[in-house]
Amino acid sequence: MLHSLFRLTLLFYALFNSLGSLPVFVALLKKFSFRKQQRIILRECIFALLTLILFITFGQGFFRLLEVSLPAFQLTGGILLGSLAINMMKALPSQEETFDQYEDEPIFYPLAFPVITGPATITSTLGHMEEGIFPKELVLGAIMLAWAFSLITLFFSSSINRLFGQMGLLALERLFGISLALMAGNLMLKAISTAFNIGYYVMA
């Protein structure tokens, strides 16, 4: 149980991509005071968590209404996860110029969605809830742990950014990218195995 919790927490922490999004937060919030930055980070993280919970609560029923199958969830989640992994592995040293256009305080977009909770996070979460390998309580517990670790990471965004520097953060982000790419491949293999009943063995 603890091993599964650790694996899921690591997966969701990588999906929240708080380390990879540090330059984005630093660039968007640099004009605000430290106290204001902390309030914005907390608010945006809460928005991101509520968005994910909203999809967990109502998303499954909605997709069942559309007759979306488990293999479709797994395959789509794998593709989105793979796309996110490729973007993480191809990350560029600085994104500050991209966000100079935002003059006002960011509310929900782009920090809560899609920077913290994006399509890959939502689809992967729904896929894990739908396939039933892990108890839903375990998945929700892992999400809350990953969210808490992500919040702590973002609270110290400026300090971590200075400590590791751009190259150090890039190395960490690419390491997470490789892990996500492997998870994406596993999800797609699960989808093919389930759809065609070919007996692919997947460790829980």
Swiss-Prot record:
UniProt KW keywords: Cell membrane, Membrane, Transmembrane, Transmembrane helix
InterPro entries the record matches: Multi_antbiot-R_MarC (IPR002771)
Highest taxon of source: Bacteria
Principal place of residence: membrane
Pfam family, one: MarC
Spans traversing the lipid bilayer: 8-28, 46-66, 68-88, 107-127, 138-158, 176-196
Location relative to the cell: Cell membrane
GO cellular component, one term: plasma membrane
Membrane-related topology note: Multi-pass membrane protein
Family: Belongs to the UPF0056 (MarC) family.
Protein name, UniProt field: UPF0056 membrane protein TC_0241
Species name: Chlamydia muridarum (strain MoPn / Nigg)
